[in-house]
Every structure is written in structure tokens, then in C-alpha cells.
């Protein structure tokens, strides 16, 4: 058997864009024949998937699956909204989500487990596809809500299904960061207080007056970023906390995922830039 050298692996990586282990495996299977290795990688889709890996995948879908008091939220990304609606993409995302629900695997474990299927799907569809995030929610009573395929929310607590569903819808729309005002971390409160005191003093208020003004502003701040402190979207004159109290319900935790959060999207090309690029090609 021919020897697979580091130089061969390096050359194959440069020619295909695939990872080191993928290239080494391909060369071993091809008995160190680099052309055969490339041909095999093209057939398997590995080379194509590697070339697509640098493309920004900020579209996609949030999948929610529930069973026996456990819910999973999964984000799978692709490059365009068109592919996010493709049957092959949605079937793949559903399969991963169901596996996550059954195994409670981490995102890293899911990525490793479904890598071959992901690579094959990239080759078939022609876009970069990534398993990005997974989150789990457990509770005696849980409710979920999906806004299209882009936003997913699961709420766990106590109460009737309709009330918790309405809370999930509220979370989707209002993006609270914490359940209750008192859940806001001390460092977040301290930083905001410092900012508000400076704002008040810049308005010409003495330090003592500024400190008193900030008490009210801080109450408003912690209320606006917490679920129970926010105005309920279906009855804005009430807070979510007041609504829950009336219904004899409560919320223990929630998770909200939105497709593409934190991913920097590439700037869209103008029509002129697209034409110029096409002419270069």
C-alpha cells in the first residue's frame, strides 16, 4: 500500500478545501492516489461541502419537538430563505430535532452525529447548512409557539395550556431576557444605574436628586427586560405578572430562539456589483 504523506494531505486540502482528517481518510481509501481521492470526494459531496463551509448561513428554521414534559428547540441554518422551505432541508432539521429530543444531545454531539448527512445535503442543495443551537425545557406544564419558522419559544410553569401559550406568544413578540425583575443580575443593574445617574447629572441635577430619580428609572428598566414586568401584549394595561396572578398561573423558565441571532450577514450586493461579478466570471 502506498504511503499517505503529509505533503499529499496538504495538497488535497488546498485543492478541495476539506478538513485534514477528511483528506487523510480519502487518500487512505484511494491508496494515496490524489486524483482518485478527489474524484471520490466529489462523488460523496465532501469537497463541495467544504467549499460551501465559508458561506454565511444566517437563514434557516427553528424546530420545536415536545414529549412527556420535555421540549427541544433546535436551530438549523442555511444561506437563503428559499432553501429553508425546501423539503430536504426541513426533513433533515426534523430528524435532528427528534434525535435531540430522544437523546438530549448537545449541539456539538448532534453536529458530529449528523455530519455525513449534512455533507450529503450540502452537495444536493448547494448551500452551506449548519446545526447551530439546541436548547431543552422541562416542566410539569409546557407550552410552545413558533412564529413562522423563524422564532421559537417554549415556556414552562404552572397553569392552563391557553394561558401558557399566550405567554409564549408574548415572549416571541417582546423578547424578555429574564422571568422576573429580581432575576436581573446585579452587575447588569449596577451598570445601568451608573449610566442613568450620569444621564441625570448631565441634565443638571445634583447627585442626591439624580440618585432618587434613578430609583424610578431602574424599576422601569428591570421591568422592561423581564417577562412578568412587561406590559402583556394582549392586554397592555396589565403586566404579564398581573395577568398570570389573575389566572392562577406562573412561569418558571422560558427559552426563545430566533434564526440568525448574532450571525453577521454578508452585505447584499447591488445589481451593478452582481453584473460586474458575472462579467469577471
From Swiss-Prot:
**Which segment of the chain is annotated as a signal peptide?**
none
Provide any one GO MF term from the record: translation elongation factor activity
At the top level, the lineage of the source is Bacteria
Pfam short name (any one): EF_TS
Record's InterPro entries? EF-Ts_dimer_sf (IPR036402), Transl_elong_EFTs/EF1B (IPR001816), Transl_elong_EFTs/EF1B_dimer (IPR014039), Transl_elong_Ts_CS (IPR018101), UBA-like_sf (IPR009060)
Subcellular location(s): the record lists:
Cytoplasm
Q: Which CDD domains match?
A: UBA_EF-Ts (cd14275)
Segments crossing the lipid bilayer: none
Instruction: List keywords of the entry alphabetically.
Output: Cytoplasm, Elongation factor, Protein biosynthesis
Keyword Protein biosynthesis among record annotations = yes
**Chain residue ranges for the region called Involved in Mg(2+) ion dislocation from EF-Tu:** 80-83
- List the GO terms this entry assigns under cellular component, sorted alphabetically: cytoplasm
Q: Which PANTHER family does this chain map to?
A: ELONGATION FACTOR TS (PTHR11741), ELONGATION FACTOR TS, MITOCHONDRIAL (PTHR11741:SF0)
Q: Which family does it belong to?
A: Belongs to the EF-Ts family.
The UniProt function text for this chain reads: Associates with the EF-Tu.GDP complex and induces the exchange of GDP to GTP. It remains bound to the aminoacyl-tRNA.EF-Tu.GTP complex up to the GTP hydrolysis stage on the ribosome.
Q: What name does this protein carry?
A: Elongation factor Ts
Organism annotation: Vibrio campbellii (strain ATCC BAA-1116)
State which gene encodes it: tsf
